[in-house]
Amino acid sequence: MPVDLAALVAPGHTALLTVEVQDNVIGDASILPDLARAATTIVPNIATLARAARAAGVPVVHGTAETRPDRLGSNNNARLFAATAKLRPRGAPGPAPTAVLHAGIGAEPGDLVMPRLHGLS
């Protein structure tokens, strides 16, 4: 039986979710340069999806990985956490550099940005 795609993605119960599409993950400032190079081809596609979702009234939600200035809630049980800790020394003021969305995607005023302070995705 064919799936009714229009009903499946109706704006009333659908959202576009991006996860960690941030400068320090897939951008020029990435601590994972191989990942950033591999992601260059998907950034325009994500941006196109986000524009289409907004135009259709579908919420766009950006899940970001962030740290508090005091690093409370931050894990240290993976090598990736040690690498990201160097980006934001304990007590550094202002937003975490990893919280900046990739410039090719960005957040529009109506988008939701949902920070995550611990764990890996």
Regions found by a protein language model. Name each.
Residues 106-107, 112-121:
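Glycine-rich oxoanion-binding loops at beta->alpha junctions
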